[in-house]
């Protein structure tokens, strides 16, 4: 039942492993499952051939990742020029935000399987006063920006937002974020953003 599912940890959440360029199914699985089953995991694929967009499309409270290979076939030795630094960088990015998947989930866009859609969601930790916004722009989208109305924020509080990719920070009030929304600009196709936020503490 739903109560049991909410306490389960499915290490492999579906028989359909989405390793397509757009990762539409992986995004849709996460969007749907986080409403009911907060702890789950799927595969991002092999770390020598995935992008940040692929990684972020597959992120959840758990993540399965391989170094290299070809399914169940016998595997050749890992080559000496394997991009270990790149693989480590991707894994460290995921580990740096994994804790937010134990927070409250809020979808910021509609559910869609369209190749030209954006999907975004918010993970909020009310006890800590912080959270994470995950934004995914699919390959077919011609749009370069979106305004996302955030949830569960105090209108009277100022929040600091840090873009993981650019390092740019900005401060906005909860009132601005829940009415006008958070502006996100993504120029590439596909593209993605990870944006951390925290309530500003008064000194």
Task: Kindly give the residue locations of the regions a language model identified.
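A glycine-rich phosphate-binding loop feature that marks nucleotide/adenosyl-phosphate handling sites
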Residues: 1-2, 107-116
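Glycan-recognition surfaces
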Residues: 1-77
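Catalytic cores of secreted or luminal carbohydrate-active enzymes
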Residues: 56-111
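Conserved, mostly hydrophobic/aromatic
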Residues: 58, 133, 161
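Extended hydrophobic-aromatic, low-complexity segments
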Residues: 67-68, 142-146, 171
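Carbohydrate-binding surface patches
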Residues: 112-155, 194
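Solvent-exposed beta-hairpin/edge-strand motifs
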Residues: 151-167
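C-terminal beta-strand-rich structural cap/linker in extracellular carbohydrate-active enzymes
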Residues: 172-203
């Amino acid at each position: 039942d739903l109560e049991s599912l909410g306490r389960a940890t499915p290490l492999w959440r579906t028989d359909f492993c989405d390793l397509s360029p757009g990762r539409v199914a992986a995004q849709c699985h996460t969007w749907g499952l986080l409403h009911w089953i907060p702890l789950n995991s799927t595969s991002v694929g092999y770390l020598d051939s995935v992008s940040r967009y692929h990684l972020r499309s597959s992120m959840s409270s758990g993540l399965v990742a391989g170094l290299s290979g070809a399914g169940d076939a016998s595997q050749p030795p890992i080559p000496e020029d394997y991009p270990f630094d790149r693989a480590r960088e991707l894994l460290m990015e995921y580990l740096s935000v994994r804790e937010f998947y134990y927070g409250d989930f809020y979808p910021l866009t509609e559910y869609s399987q369209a190749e030209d859609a954006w999907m975004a969601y918010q993970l909020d930790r009310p006890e800590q006063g912080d959270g994470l916004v995950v934004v995914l722009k699919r390959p077919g989208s011609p749009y370069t920006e979106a305004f996302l109305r955030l949830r569960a924020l105090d209108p009277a509080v100022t929040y600091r937002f840090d873009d993981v990719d650019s390092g740019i920070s900005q401060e906005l009030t909860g009132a601005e974020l829940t009415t006008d929304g958070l502006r996100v600009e993504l120029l590439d196709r596909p593209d993605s953003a990870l944006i951390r936020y925290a309530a500003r503490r008064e000194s």
